[in-house]
Amino acid sequence: MIQHGFDMYRVYLSTPGDLLREQDACRAAISEVNANQAMPLKILLVSVGLREDGQIVGFRAAVSENVRQCTYFIQVFEDDWGPNNLYRKLLHLAAECRDDSNLPMREVIVCLKAAPHETDPAILAFRKELEDREDMRMLRFNNVENLKSQLMDVCGEWVRAIEAAGGGVKD
């Protein structure tokens, strides 16, 4: 989608409300890749998504439509699916969008925060379910700096793939 002189690609950030520092790290990674790699090529990764769980619950139809319009989806987790399995539903929607050739979704990434001392069986089962998925890339991280670094690499890959496919605004 070309607007304002840039070829724009939406990146949906999905993070439970207790992971706002991680969400900020995701936004910072996208911003740095934009400034250093994407914008010189007239490409722009645009982060979208709501910051609070309640906002998502209150606007489910709009959030779902937002996911459907995105090219990339980043899901950050630590210990559960959020209230009423809210983030499980978003993750499954993103995977369905990626598998639908009529939609722009290209990749779904799960970022799983380390929980080395976790012993709760329900949380361990949740983490195993995520780790057993083979249909999406899994990034494991132990702090926000590590998350940001890994996402900068991923976003850089996306920019290079967009450029290789002929994306960007040509002068």
Descriptions of predicted regions:
Residues D53, D79-D80, P104-T119, E145:
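Short beta-alpha junction loops
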Residues A25, A29, A62, N66, ...:
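Alpha-helical scaffold elements adjacent to nucleotide-binding pockets in ATP/GTP-utilizing enzyme cores
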Residues Q3, L112-D171:
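C-terminal interaction surface of TIR/SEFIR-family domains
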Residues R21, G82-L86, D120, S149:
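Extracytoplasmic/secreted cell-surface and envelope-processing proteins
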Residues M1-V76, N102-M105, V169-D171:
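Conserved N-terminal substructure of TIR/SEFIR domains
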